[in-house]
């Protein structure tokens, strides 16, 4: 069943719960442990294949089937993952990949930085607003990410993922919506390829910006 997509403009400012962000109640929306890798995830993985250096520390937000970790574990010093469903955490543990840890943690939560003890050169999130309950927790998520990102690190997302939202939460995003980050945080946003975008701390070497329809 289709639903009317929300945008940042039409989403609510605050859900009313500071400490506990809302979570979708749509059946099956949270457990992707036995599903195939999504097209948006595949697009990001294709980019990482060309730029990921040995020894990278990666945070993968929304681990799904953990095939991302399986693919990149050999060249990473650490891959930490986040999930909202215990089945994904259990599935990840069965793979017994070295330096791979999955946390049951909401990316919009104020507990984010207390739970994650490391810093990362790469943070992968196919759709930052997919499960967002409100503007307040959406902006908290970005503060969470920047709090664990290294000074030369990069957050990577994908337009195909940003085009989706849940029936009861989240909203779609455009490249123009991502550019709003530059007004709130010391970051720069730029396309890495058509449809895959990178967000970096502003004081790093500038990324050449390609023209993208907002």
PLM regions: where:
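Class I S-adenosyl-L-methionine
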Residues: 167-214
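Class I SAM-dependent methyltransferase SAM/SAH-binding core
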Residues: 65-109
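A short acidic, Gly/Pro-enriched loop at the edge of an enzyme's catalytic core
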Residues: 112-123
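Class I SAM-dependent methyltransferase Rossmann-like catalytic core
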Residues: 3-51
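A short, conserved alpha-helix within the catalytic core of class I
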Residues: 131-145
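Conserved class I S-adenosyl-L-methionine
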Residues: 55-64
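Conserved beta-strand signature within the Rossmann-like core of class I S-adenosyl-L-methionine
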Residues: 152-161
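A short beta-strand submotif of the Rossmann-like class I SAM-dependent methyltransferase core
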Residues: 125-128
């Amino acid at each position: 069943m289709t639903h009317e997509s929300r945008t940042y403009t039409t989403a609510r400012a605050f859900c009313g719960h500071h400490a506990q962000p809302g979570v979708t109640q749509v059946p099956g929306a949270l457990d992707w442990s036995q599903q195939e890798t999504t097209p948006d995830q595949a697009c990001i993985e294709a980019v990482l294949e060309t730029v990921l250096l040995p020894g990278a520390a990666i945070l993968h937000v929304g681990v799904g089937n953990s095939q991302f970790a399986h693919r990149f574990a050999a060249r990473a010093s650490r891959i930490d993952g986040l999930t909202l469903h215990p089945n994904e955490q259990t599935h990840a543990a069965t793979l017994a990949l070295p330096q791979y840890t999955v946390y049951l943690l909401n990316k919009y939560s104020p507990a984010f930085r207390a739970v994650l003890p490391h810093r990362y050169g790469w943070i992968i999130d196919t759709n930052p607003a997919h499960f967002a309950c409100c503007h307040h927790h959406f902006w908290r998520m970005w503060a969470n990410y920047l709090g664990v990102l290294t000074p030369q690190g990069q957050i990577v997302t994908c337009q195909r993922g940003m085009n989706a939202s849940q029936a009861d939460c989240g909203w779609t995003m455009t490249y123009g919506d991502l550019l709003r980050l530059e007004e709130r945080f010391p970051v720069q946003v730029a396309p890495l390829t058509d449809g895959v975008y990178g967000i970096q701390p502003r004081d790093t070497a500038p990324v050449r910006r390609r023209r993208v329809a907002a």
